[in-house]
UniProtKB/Swiss-Prot annotation:
InterPro entries with a match to the protein in the record: Iml2/TPR_39
Keywords recorded for this protein, A-Z: Cytoplasm, Nucleus, Phosphoprotein
Subunit (UniProt): Interacts with lipid droplet proteins.
Gene: iml2
Chain residue ranges for the region called Disordered: 177-199
The protein's name: Inclusion body clearance protein iml2
Organism name: Aspergillus clavatus (strain ATCC 1007 / CBS 513.65 / DSM 816 / NCTC 3887 / NRRL 1 / QM 1276 / 107)
Protein family according to the UniProt entry: Belongs to the IML2 family.
Pfam family, one: Iml2-TPR_39
Length: 721
């Protein structure tokens, strides 16, 4: 362990490299326990250590708990631990630089002395930033952006060392490059000062000043846009030369280290820690920034953040190769991205089958190998069972996905168990297993406090579906489900707004409160029970918002069409009273199902009917103002899926009534046909991206951002002749 006093009082300095190695070795067992869901055991294993690595480990434990559960008390604990880890790492970094010439000190061929502690600082800052942004306090959210900026700069400096090492290794003679531990002179001269300046460039005084400013501004939280408060955080001029940040996110694979863990350059644990850690942290940062909705991405670029999805994914894949805690967390991030985000989005870059270099499609074989490796490495962890279930769902095997989450052991970690239950609830919803879905969401309510209004809302929606199913067959059963549906619908709105993200209400909380208020107003106006004032099946609406259609087989999709048909059936006594808004929702949901069934002409006909109407019909008090922008996105998705390239990978349309949907036989005409489809897709996306603020715009914005990036990539690889 480090003893700061021996350095402060001028005694013989300890060998920092040896102590770093000892601490990293000590952390192996606790790290394994974390990924085997034994967080309490990991806490015990970390309790005795006082090094920066042990402090960071304790911060990681709290961070995992905080981000899996979103509970405020755990977030506060994580923030405190991460602050402590950042402080001790800063002290140790300065000492490592001071003692860099001590006898027997290890000198990395890639990194300057103290880089491992700079990475510890950056990791603590990055995790602290995430906790801050997830915090309900606007002040903490703004502090989080400062920490994010500091971590960004430090990680960029570390990765520039790797780039410099690669460049100088290519120019070195075989004898020079074979010498272990040799450091290019230019790195010795420049690296240390660059790291030190980057890590201290944003002073704590500035953070305190921003926090104070944020506190002053925080009174009218509901009426103030966060973007207005962050526009003053443009820090690029203080820390990087113009263009440096942009340059950091535009490097190609040739500028990145992609060696395997058994490569000779990774013979030292310190180098392994720095390389895997910096690749994971910067990779996740670049990926997340690239995914944010259009309005927020503009704000991030103003204050100096630039995402790069492809580079971020390559870095995460690289980090996942390593057999340590960082490698496992990188693997979890990779699997979560592909099985969650990619399957949530409908317009993504085309996959290139059989190419490991392809990172923006869905590299199924590569993902299966990664998951198998993780399950073998951490056999007791329910996290990897959860990821296997997600992978099954992503590949349209929902029955197996649900089976994996219904049996077997539960996780001793409450937050993991809550995730498992939530995923089980969604899968049951996609499969129209209403009883299981309702029971599972009620279990989520007991385990997690994040979005309890949504849990009650979906539970009520399940009982509404059961009520409609039993209405003609079993009136007593129907009355029972009607009572439960009304109970949970009325319980949901008072819970909305209890949790906040960057001082704002959660999007689905706003949605739930408005929907129930709309139904209550209709019930009063029509003089009917609440359950008869609902309109289009809210479960089908939820399936759409969670993009369950992409996980459903044709059989499940046809069942959704049957559920939607109830609205227009004789069983629905209030359909004749419905206006254009509810009828547009029905058309939109049907169009989404038809698109997933690859019946694009039917989908487009329904969407064109919506878009031909006056947009003002869908605006106003208690109205579903999301209908038109979402219809534009759905049109874009149909255009994307009608391209010859998409058809070659995923199969063709299941209808042949639309002459435009027939792919030209001539290759040159085929490219022009595809270009036309991409152009139309882009036009619809631009309209959706530029739409005024609407309910759930952040959620839909994620899909729009990913789609615009996919279109841009297609245009870059297919320039006009």
């Amino acid at each position: 362990m480090f003893r700061v006093g021996s350095w402060l009082y001028g005694k013989k300095p300890a060998n920092a490299s040896t102590q770093s190695l000892d601490s990293l070795v000590e952390l192996r067992d606790p790290a394994t326990l974390i990924l085997n869901d034994d967080v309490d055991g990991a806490e015990d294993g970390l309790a005795e250590g006082t090094s920066s690595f042990h402090n960071l480990g304790r911060g990681v434990v709290a961070f995992i708990r905080a981000t899996l559960g979103f509970e405020q008390d755990i977030m506060r604990q994580a923030s405190e631990r991460l602050n402590e880890a950042e402080t001790t790492a800063s002290v140790d970094q300065h000492r490592a630089q001071h003692n860099s010439q001590a006898p027997n000190t290890y000198h990395s061929a890639m990194y300057t002395p103290g880089t491992e502690f700079a990475l510890c600082q950056a990791m603590a800052q990055l995790m602290g930033a995430v906790v801050g942004v997830l915090n309900e306090s606007l002040t903490e959210s703004i502090k989080g952006f400062y920490r994010l900026r500091k971590a960004y700069i430090t990680l960029d400096a570390i990765l520039k060392m790797e780039q410099k090492y690669l460049q100088e290794s290519r120019m070195a003679t075989p004898i020079e490059s074979a010498a272990p531990g040799s450091i290019p002179l230019s790195m010795k001269r420049q690296g240390s000062s660059n790291l030190q300046s980057s890590s201290s460039s944003i002073s704590s005084a500035k953070i305190k000043k921003a926090a104070s400013s944020a506190t002053t501004l925080a009174a009218p939280v509901e009426n103030t846009d966060l973007s207005e408060r962050l526009t003053g955080l443009n820090l690029s001029s203080e820390t990087l030369a113009p263009g440096d940040v942009k340059e950091a996110s535009t490097l190609g694979p040739a500028d990145m280290l992609n060696h395997d863990p058994d490569s000779d350059i990774f013979h030292n644990q310190i180098d392994i820690f720095v390389h895997s850690g910096s690749n994971f942290c910067f990779g996740i940062l670049l990926l997340l920034i690239s995914m944010v909705p259009p309005a927020f991405s503009k704000l991030l670029s103003i204050i100096g953040f630039h995402g790069d999805k492809e580079r971020g994914l390559r870095m995460l894949w690289q980090a996942s190769k390593f057999h340590n805690l960082i490698g496992a967390i990188a693997a979890f991030s990779v699997l979560g991205y592909y099985n969650g985000f990619v399957r949530y989005c409908d317009i993504m870059p085309d996959s290139i089958p059989g190419q490991d270099e392809d990172v923006q499609g869905y590299p199924q074989e590569r993902l299966e190998l990664l998951l198998a490796k993780m399950r073998k490495q951490f056999p007791k962890s329910q996290l990897w069972v959860l990821e296997e279930s997600r992978m099954c769902g992503a590949n349209k095997n929902l029955d197996r996905a649900l089976e994996l989450l219904c049996g077997g052991e539960s996780s001793p970690l409450k937050q993991v168990e809550a995730l498992r239950l939530f995923e089980r609830s969604l899968n049951a919803m996609y499969l129209h297993k209403y009883e299981l879905c309702a029971a599972s969401f009620l279990e989520c309510f007991e385990l997690n406090t994040w979005s309890r209004s949504l849990y009650y809302y979906i539970t009520g929606s399940c009982h509404l579906s059961l009520y409609r199913n039993a209405l003609d067959k079993d009136p007593a059963k129907a009355a029972e489900h009607a009572e439960l549906a009304e109970k949970y619908f009325r319980l949901a709105p008072p819970l909305a707004g209890k949790k906040r993200f960057m001082a704002r209400q959660l999007p689905f909380d706003v949605f739930v409160a408005r929907k129930v208020a709309k139904w209550e107003a209709r019930a009063k106006d029509w003089k009917v029970p609440l359950v008869d004032a609902v309109g289009v099946d809210p479960i089908e609406e939820m399936i759409f918002f969670w993009n369950g259609h992409s996980r459903m087989t044709d059989e499940h999709l046809l069942e959704s069409l049957q559920k939607l048909a109830w609205c227009e059936s004789s069983a629905n006594k209030t359909w004749s009273r419905e206006g254009p808004e509810e009828k547009a929702i029905l058309k939109l949901l049907r169009a989404a199902v038809f698109r997933s069934l690859r019946k694009h002409s039917q989908a487009k006909d329904l969407l064109e009917d919506i878009l031909s109407q006056d947009r003002n019909l869908f605006k106003g008090h208690l109205k579903d103002d999301w209908i038109c922008p979402v219809a534009h996105f759905e049109m874009a998705a149909n255009m994307w899926m009608e391209r010859p390239t998409y058809i070659a990978i995923h199969g063709g349309s299941k209808e042949f009534t639309d002459p435009e949907a027939t792919e030209p036989a001539d290759s040159s005409k085929s490219l022009e046909y595809e270009r036309e489809k991409v152009h139309k897709c882009k036009e619809y996306l631009e309209k959706a991206a530029k739409w005024e603020s609407y309910e759930l715009d952040a959620r839909i914005g994620l899909k729009v951002t990913a789609a615009m990036e996919a279109v841009q990539k297609w245009e870059n690889t297919h320039p006009p002749a």
